[in-house]
Amino acid sequence: AWANELNTPVFVVKAQIHAGGRGKAGGVKITKDKAAVAGLAKELIGKTLVTHQTGPKGRQVHRLLLEEGANIGKELYLSILVDRDSGWPVFIASTEGGMEIEEVAEKTPEKIIKELIDPAVGFQGYNGRNVAFALGLNTIEPAVMNPFIQMMGNLYRLFMEKHAAMVEINPLIITKEKTIVALDGKVSFDDNALFKHADVQQMRDLNEEEPLEIEAGANNLNYVKLDGNIGCMVNGAGLAMATMDVIKLAGSEPANFLDVGGGATKETVAAGFRILLKDPNVKGIFINIFGGIVRCERIAHGVIEAAKEVKITVPLVVRLQGTNAEEGRKLLAESGLKLDVADDLWEAAQKIVKLTGKAA
């Protein structure tokens, strides 16, 4: 029925998943036959697409986009994100549209154009002209110069007003009719600023999110699922990254990033245990806590109570360091729970890797 709403000679049916590489994975179908659109839609709905960004499990298609085919003359790439060196917004552009920008940067870095934007001044016309001339739009198609510069200004406004982490158009096309069209776009938002943007939150598609990450968010935990077999529970993002690094050095792979924050109370630890144990890949759990503001004996009590509440069926290693760490380790050792206690990070990592086996 929706095909009848489009007056076009070419129909494009696109799978809507939060990953790139859909075309190569068979997630984009093109037809000139209006009657064939429904069949293509049925073929894609429910299909699992495996791309270089989905991981081996892939993502199931729950939503589709039907749009008009475009008369493509030239494909470009355009995005805006935060430059980590300067802390300023930076536009990234390339004449190699339609490709993964990481691949372009690796193989032909000279084709990557960057334009920093001073946030104290904001986007200016000269910023747009710098990028437009660097792309060669003045020779490729002068008619699109002004619309392109206006589009850059709109992207900058979207990026700043909605607290985006990245806005990407790939490909940005110049049609044979001498118009400029954003053929595909992605916007990533800063999770920490979402409370300011109810309109953005309403667009959230839980089908595209990891169920365990949704559960973690509901418990105020920072959780990212990974592909390893050792579940990590840590307080502090920096310590969490160091923990993942040392697990790799010891010969295995982390199953997640899980930051329980500064509290590490019975409730947060219990929620963390439940989330980790729902992952069938987890063969062991490594708790690595540094007691700074929160004393280690309080953390130990939280771990003990949570472990009694949640049935733990895999090896557990707990490393405590910081304020009253010795008292905390003593409480754990005398708790009667089946766990290993350590004070040294490398020793603890080696213990959990030995108990779970090295990664294949």
Language model: regions and residue ranges:
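Catalytic core of bacterial c-di-GMP phosphodiesterases, primarily the EAL and HD-GYP domains
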Residues: G292
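Short internal beta-strands
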Residues: T313-G322
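ATP-dependent carboxylate/acyl-activation modules
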Residues: A1-I169, I173-I287, E297-I299, K308, ...
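Short amphipathic alpha-helix used as the core "switch/output" element in two-component signaling
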Residues: I304-E305
